[in-house]
Amino acid sequence: MEKDMKLLGMGLFWNDLAVGDRFGTVGRTLTETDLVNFVNLAWLTEELFTNTEERENMAIAGRVVPAALVYACAEGLLLPMMQGTGLAFLNATLDVKGPTFVGDTIHVECSVSEVRATSKGNRGLVRTENEVVNQRGETVLAYNPLRMMKGRDS
């Protein structure tokens, strides 16, 4: 690619972000295929996710999906924010607020809560408060990752 050509799809640099900045992602519908593939990949053989007959006797109606799948999809939805600029995922707390089901469409609402330089000036730490919201406007998952991100060259 030519040096003077602008690259589409690159993430944000830590020094372009400020506390209070807010972002939203596009939506993604979770499908039966997503559930089956994730459960098989992670070997989450809990009958809650694998046995539709047993589901009839449980308190939650519908095909519930693991919160780990919801989290993984949320991170994928946020990827454009960090594409090529994210360096490390350092930590997070995670709180499951409610069930997510096959057929639900989720998006992520993200608010920057912390931005600071590291001792190496070309890197920074960014913490966001992320809420995963379904099509009914219900927050189903909340987490606050701290990430190391590249800085914009001066």
Regions found by a protein language model. Name each.
Residues 1-91, 152-154:
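Hot-dog-fold acyl-thioester-processing enzymes
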